[in-house]
């Protein structure tokens, strides 16, 4: 009986260690895929001078709208209200067909950190021009202020 209990304990222990040593990657899809970002965030914050981001889904909504439109958050402060763990999905920088989007507001991290962010440029396809592809948290910034 002791031998069975010992084997059971050993199997459980090795299983726990395997999960800790070899974590399972949950990075499937993009933060910009429908359902991965908070579609209501912009509507709730559009008229505010300071736009507060409290969740990774809200952060993704900020990024999705910034990279998919020509609106560049002028005269707006975008402030983090919490640390952002962005490891659930990849930050796939979409190809903006106009190549005119950029961030021009104030991004205030307010002492919070963004972790687990995997930035991936968009795949080749319609509208892709390797000479003009930008990839990053903002893609392009112009007359912007970035604070920690």
Predicted features, each with a name:
Residues 1-9:
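Bacterial N-terminal signal peptides that target proteins for export
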């Amino acid at each position: 009986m002791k031998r069975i209990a010992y084997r059971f304990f050993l199997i459980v222990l090795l299983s726990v260690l395997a999960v800790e040593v070899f974590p399972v990657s949950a990075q499937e899809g993009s933060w910009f895929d429908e359902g991965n970002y908070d579609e209501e965030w912009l509507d709730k914050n559009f008229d505010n001078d300071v736009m507060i981001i409290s969740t990774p889904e809200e952060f993704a909504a900020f990024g999705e709208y910034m990279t998919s439109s020509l609106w560049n958050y002028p005269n707006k402060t975008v402030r983090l209200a919490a640390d952002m763990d962005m490891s659930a999905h990849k930050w796939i920088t979409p190809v903006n067909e106009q190549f005119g989007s950029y961030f021009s507001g104030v991004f205030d991290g307010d002492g919070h950190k963004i972790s687990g962010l995997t930035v991936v440029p968009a795949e080749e396809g319609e509208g892709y021009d390797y000479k003009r592809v930008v990839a990053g948290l903002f893609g392009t910034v112009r007359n912007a202020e970035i604070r920690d």
